[in-house]
């Protein structure tokens, strides 16, 4: 490990160590599969896979005679076909068999048949948090989606409440503020008046509806109150006699009051609009929206005079026809259907989270009911009305209390739920069979739906992604990513600005910096460093508890909901050893407001300044001195750094480098403390101190030069010697882009900030030749080429060195089997695997058939179908793999074997490669200058790199200057620094270091021109900057074509490097040539170089023969236009001067010749 000097304003030690950075993946999958509990034979919790089985079983037959019951499941871990390494080699999936113990019970006879039933295979997670599917490492990204529960929001003039279940129908209530009516919508179908909906649910009288939502007051009817009564609403119906019936909810008129007085009604019950305050837990309302709806009912159903209430049939008919238009209706069915939509566990599930949110919102303690209750519906309506009246506030949809995270485990649980419901259906069908008594449990279960669902999820789901494996940081960040897209999430086009924006609840939970720059900005984010996901799927972040103004060491994890309205101090607030704050006013935040307050009001305090950003951003020193846009680019570009052959950790780090290396999974860590007894390049053996016997040893296999998903090189190197003592958890071997157990993505270079002869104009970079010679930025890239050997209709294909019409020079590189030898240097066009395919016999002449029968098979024709090195690729063959049917049982039908050849290429830094620092300062290498021509310092040291000073002011990433100043001091003092984010070294500290190292405190030096030896006119800022080489290499982008493939219909050259395509000559290029009057050039480009088929052949022929040429034919695109017009029924033909038809196709030519 490297000794680092802590240089910053804060304390070097943190109260809380960083958690394991990939625990979001590991914990989620462990919750799903509960492997640890299965191994230790402990009882399983009702979550993940266990909960799926418990919910589906028992499956009972229609008549109730037979039941299939679930006992337990287990994973056959010992029967794994391949190890992780073999899976990658052979293109297999790393998975185990899932078996379920089922009991088939015959309730009539009491007989029970038990069987362990095969339930398909289930992919296992590696210790690095990845899955290996078909030989490639994949990551299942966590999804952030809208939490189930209830939300209240406003769109234009509509106030809405929405109850979102985990599974089932959405229920929406909306108040139209122009008309003062309240409607309900189920699954976004037609609106239904709220009172009708309530009647359908059982509030069948006007009185019931009114007493549910309104406070009721009793008023004496007498001369004194006579004037106050008109205009008020009755809460209880009054029946004086046959034709004098006053309904609840009707407005009282002066005439009514007279009638009351005359008929001896002394007391009436009225709606009390002022008594809306919470009375013993009831939530009464103060607006007449519900009463308006009752009035609207009358208009909707023309009630016959004298009828007191709406008939149930009319209500059900109205509600049911809105929900299920066009379906036949019977009243009992209608009632049942409506009840099952929300109140049956089979059709509706709020989920734990939905119930938790509802209870939290309305102040209940119930956390178990998974379906809706009448109380939930009433409370939601009341709350919406209170918001409409202005007594309560709307919800913020983008608040992290309304968004939750679904990780691997939960996503897989949902996949299994869907598949198991299909299994259940099939089992029930099979149970209804007459011969059910002869059945065994395994005959009832169909595995197909499960296998296909799991396969489809891992292979094609938007959330199961090919792992970004450019370097360890890219790997780590990919596993910590949160994605708002995917099934059940948002879509790019419909996501507005608000969803993408930074919200105050993101503090400590999601990084405000790290997100892509393109159309996905803000939809794909990263987890903050200390953040974790709680049981409900909400993001939590840790805080130190502050009691009576004193900071304690007690830690609490708070979700966004818990944190609301709490007063939280920053991590760098000063306090003494007793925890007393030193200032009288401390900077705090309360929800989204930043203010100051006295220590006694503080509830919590941040645990660390880097709490609010992600791992990538926490690797940028002096982050707080950079503009946010550049910090974003810096975070993103560190993930694109190519692992180098000789990387070095940065002189100026942030302290996160060792944490990232440790948790990334690319280094080898000691499992137990002990002594190293063997250390070779490929293997380390440690004898643990607490070894039970002489054979109890820890063996570690070192990975050498393997290919990653992105064709970079995965190579581990040993850090320990034989006889060395190692501690548990100590890093004993480095991985790619790590050095001495620290992340090392690039190298430290001596920098001059100076324009140099225009070579570093516009972000271009000038580099010294020394860097190339010393291989500071040399990386190895490994490409895989594979070929299948198939069984064809005409016979099998063969791998052989005996290939027709191929020169001996090329065949010399192949071994006796026709496969390239390991260690051979190959160039484009070389054969890697010789393969011949039988040719179809087609129209063989009788003479040829005679020859075949005389000389046997020899004369049979074969076609050369060898695997060749594609254009633009060269390198050394480092490995060849042959995978046959004996090795793996599941090769595709018709495939006999697969051959894979690995070609490695050492790539030095060259002009056109992209480089970047950690502050978003990116550029392309424009010139590599000999060392002697580079500007040099007074002591003769030449610079390594020159950057343009104009790259700094407008970009506002001052961090790069501070880093290079401190780096310069560190290089000459032989020190490495930890400069934590948000607590960086001050200018005074940096200047102090520069003075100690013997430099000018401004780090400006006199530079000398390498060409003339003269000093430059002004002093130049000099420093040591950490630069990375990015995965945008010029070798992968350079491309040239002379002739190549053509598009089938238009016969024009294809486009793009992957298709070996040509350059497109677009409209603007044509205009330019027209403007020059370059007629012949233009004609050639638009015809023979593009899509004039006969012209292409003729011109090639003429060039070969050396004949001057001017061929012009008809371009194929003209023929396409002709055929399209003919498709419209317009026959178009062309005639020459003499009136003869010009043939456009060979077929036409034949027809003309015949006629």
From Swiss-Prot:
Q: A single Gene Ontology molecular function, please?
A: ribonucleoside binding
Catalyzed reaction equations: RNA(n) + a ribonucleoside 5'-triphosphate = RNA(n+1) + diphosphate
- GO annotation, biological process: DNA-templated transcription
Q: Which Gene3D superfamilies match?
A: 2.40.50.100, 2.40.50.150, 3.90.1100.10, DNA-directed RNA polymerase, beta subunit, external 1 domain, DNA-directed RNA polymerase, subunit 2, domain 6, RNA polymerase alpha subunit dimerisation domain, RNA polymerase Rpb2, domain 2
> Sorted alphabetically, which keywords does the UniProt record give?
DNA-directed RNA polymerase, Nucleotidyltransferase, Transcription, Transferase
Query: Mind telling me which SUPFAM superfamilies this protein's record contains?
Result: beta and beta-prime subunits of DNA dependent RNA-polymerase
What top-level branch of life does the organism fall under? Bacteria
Q: What class of enzyme is it?
A: transferase
Under Enzyme Commission nomenclature, its number is: 2.7.7.6
Disulfide pairs? Answer: none
Say if the entry is tagged with keyword Transcription: yes
Sorted alphabetically, the Gene Ontology cellular component annotations on this record are: DNA-directed RNA polymerase complex
Q: What does the annotation say about its assembly with partners?
A: The RNAP catalytic core consists of 2 alpha, 1 beta, 1 beta' and 1 omega subunit. When a sigma factor is associated with the core the holoenzyme is formed, which can initiate transcription.
Protein role: DNA-dependent RNA polymerase catalyzes the transcription of DNA into RNA using the four ribonucleoside triphosphates as substrates.
HAMAP family per record: RNApol_bact_RpoB
Cross-referenced NCBIfam families, in alphabetical order? PRK00405.1, rpoB
Q: Which PANTHER family match?
A: DNA-DIRECTED RNA POLYMERASE I SUBUNIT 2
The family this protein is said to belong to: Belongs to the RNA polymerase beta chain family.
Q: What is this protein called?
A: DNA-directed RNA polymerase subunit beta
What is the primary gene name for this protein? rpoB
């Amino acid at each position: 490990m490297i000794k680092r000097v802590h240089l910053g304003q804060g304390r070097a030690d943190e109260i809380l160590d960083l958690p394991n950075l990939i625990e979001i993946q590991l914990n989620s999958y462990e919750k799903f599969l509960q492997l640890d509990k299965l191994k230790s034979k402990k009882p399983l919790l009702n979550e993940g896979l266990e909960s799926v089985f418990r919910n589906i079983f028992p499956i009972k037959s229609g008549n109730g005679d037979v039941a299939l019951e679930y006992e337990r499941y287990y994973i056959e871990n010992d029967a794994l076909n391949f190890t992780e390494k073999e899976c990658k080699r052979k293109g297999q999936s790393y998975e185990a068999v899932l078996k379920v113990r089922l009991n088939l019970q015959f309730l009539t006879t009491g007989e029970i048949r038990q069987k362990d039933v095969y339930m398909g295979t289930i992919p296992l997670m590696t210790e690095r948090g990845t899955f290996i599917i078909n030989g490639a490492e994949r990551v299942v990204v966590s999804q952030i989606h809208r939490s189930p529960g209830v939300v209240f929001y406003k769109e234009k003039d509509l106030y809405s409440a929405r109850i979102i279940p985990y599974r089932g129908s959405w229920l929406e209530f909306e108040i139209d503020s122009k008309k003062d009516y309240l409607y309900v919508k189920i699954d976004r179908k037609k609106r239904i008046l709220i009172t009708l909906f309530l009647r359908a649910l059982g509030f069948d009288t006007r009185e019931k509806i009114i007493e549910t939502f309104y406070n009721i007051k009793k008023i004496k009817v007498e001369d004194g109150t006579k004037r106050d009564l008109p205009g008020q609403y009755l809460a209880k119906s009054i029946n004086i006699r046959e034709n004098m019936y006053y309904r609840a909810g009707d407005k009282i008129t002066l005439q009514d009051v007279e009638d009351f007085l005359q008929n001896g009604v002394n007391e009436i019950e009225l709606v009390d609009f002022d008594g809306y305050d919470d009375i013993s837990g009831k939530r009464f309302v103060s607006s007449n929206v519900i009463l308006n709806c009752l009035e609207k009912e009358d208009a909707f159903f023309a009630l016959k005079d004298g009828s007191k209430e709406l008939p149930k049939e009319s209500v059900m008919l109205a509600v049911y026809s809105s929900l299920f238009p066009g379906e036949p209706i019977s009243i009992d069915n209608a009632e049942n259907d409506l009840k099952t939509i929300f109140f049956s566990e089979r059709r509706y599930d709020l989920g734990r989270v939905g119930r938790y949110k509802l209870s939290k919102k309305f102040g209940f303690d119930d956390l178990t009911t998974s379906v809706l209750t009448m109380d939930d519906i009433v409370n939601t309506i009341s709350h919406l009305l209170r918001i409409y009246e202005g007594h309560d506030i709307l919800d913020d949809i983008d608040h992290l209390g309304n968004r939750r995270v679904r990780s691997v485990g939960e996503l897989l649980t949902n996949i299994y739920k869907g598949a198991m419901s299909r299994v259940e259906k099939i089992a029930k069908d099979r149970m209804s069979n007459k011969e059910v008594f002869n059945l065994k449990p395994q005959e009832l279960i169909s595995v197909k739906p499960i296998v296909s669902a799991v396969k489809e999820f891992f292979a094609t789901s938007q959330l199961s992604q090919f792992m970004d494996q450019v370097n360890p940081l890219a790997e780590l960040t990919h596993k910590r990513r949160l994605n708002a897209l995917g099934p059940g999430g948002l879509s790019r086009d419909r996501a507005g600005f608000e969803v993408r924006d930074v919200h105050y609840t993101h503090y400590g939970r999601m990084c405000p910096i790290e997100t892509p720059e393109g159309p996905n900005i803000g939809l794909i984010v990263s987890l903050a460093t200390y953040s974790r996901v709680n049981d409900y799927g909400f993001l939590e972040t840790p805080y130190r508890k502050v009691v009576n103004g004193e900071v304690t060491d007690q830690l609490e994890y708070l979700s966004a909901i818990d944190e609301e309205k709490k007063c939280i101090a920053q991590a760098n607030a000063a306090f003494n050893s007793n925890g007393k704050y030193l200032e009288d006013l401390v900077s705090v935040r309360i929800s989204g407001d930043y203010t100051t307050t006295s220590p006694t009001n503080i509830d919590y305090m941040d645990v660390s300044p880097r709490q609010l950003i992600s791992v990538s951003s926490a690797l940028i020193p002096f982050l707080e001195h950079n503009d946010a846009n550049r910090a974003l680019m810096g975070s993103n570009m560190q993930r694109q750094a190519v692992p180098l052959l000789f990387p070095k950790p940065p002189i100026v780090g942030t302290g996160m480098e060792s944490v990232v290396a440790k948790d990334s999974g690319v280094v080898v860590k000691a499992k137990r403390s002990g002594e190293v007894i063997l250390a070779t390049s490929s293997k380390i053996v440690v004898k643990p101190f607490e070894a039970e016997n002489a054979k109890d040893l820890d063996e570690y296999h070192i990975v050498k030069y393997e290919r990653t998903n992105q064709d970079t090189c995965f190579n581990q190197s040993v850090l320990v010697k034989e006889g060395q003592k190692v501690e548990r958890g100590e890093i004993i071997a480095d991985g790619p882009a790590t050095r001495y157990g620290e992340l090392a993505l690039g190298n430290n270079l001596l920098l001059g900030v100076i324009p140099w002869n225009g070579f570093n104009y516009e972000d271009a970079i000038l580099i010294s030749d020394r860097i190339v010679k010393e291989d500071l930025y040399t990386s190895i890239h490994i490409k895989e080429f594979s070929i299948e050997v198939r069984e064809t209709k005409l016979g099998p294909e063969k791998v052989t060195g005996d290939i027709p019409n191929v020169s001996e020079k090329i065949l010399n590189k192949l071994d006796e089997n026709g496969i390239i030898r390991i260690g051979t240097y190959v160039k484009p066009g070389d054969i890697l695997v010789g393969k011949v395919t039988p040719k179809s016999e087609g129209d063989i002449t009788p003479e040829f058939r005679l020859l075949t029968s005389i000389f046997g098979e020899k004369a049979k024709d074969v076609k050369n179908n060898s695997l060749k090195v594609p254009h633009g690729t060269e390198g050394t063959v480092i490995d060849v793999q042959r995978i046959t049917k004996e090795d793996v049982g599941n090769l595709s039908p018709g495939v006999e074997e697969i051959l894979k050849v690995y070609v490695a290429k050492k790539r030095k830094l060259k002009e056109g490669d992209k480089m970047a620092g950690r502050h978003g300062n990116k550029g392309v290498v424009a010139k590599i200058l000999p060392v002697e021509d580079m500007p040099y310092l007074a002591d003769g040291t030449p610079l390594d790199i020159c950057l343009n000073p104009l790259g700094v002011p407008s970009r506002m990433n001052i961090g790069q200057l501070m880093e290079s100043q401190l780096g310069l001091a560190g290089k000459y003092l032989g020190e490495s620094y930890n400069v934590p984010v948000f607590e960086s070294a001050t200018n005074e500290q940096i200047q102090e270091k520069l003075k100690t190292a013997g430099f000018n405190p401004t780090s400006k030096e006199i530079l000398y021109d390498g060409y003339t030896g003269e000093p430059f006119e002004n002093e130049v800022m000099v420093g040591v900057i950490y630069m990375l080489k990015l995965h945008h290499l010029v070798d992968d982008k350079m491309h040239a074509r002379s002739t190549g493939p053509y598009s089938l219909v238009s016969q024009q050259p294809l486009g793009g490097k992957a298709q070996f395509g040509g350059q497109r000559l677009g409209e603007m290029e044509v205009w330019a040539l027209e403007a020059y009057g370059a007629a012949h050039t233009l004609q050639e480009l638009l015809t023979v170089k593009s899509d004039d088929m006969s012209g292409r052949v003729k011109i090639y022929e003429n060039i070969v023969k050396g004949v001057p040429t001017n061929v012009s034919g008809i371009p194929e695109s003209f023929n396409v236009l002709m055929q399209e017009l003919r498709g419209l029924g317009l026959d178009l033909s062309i005639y020459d001067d003499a009136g003869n038809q010009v043939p456009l196709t060979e077929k036409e030519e034949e027809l003309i010749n015949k006629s």
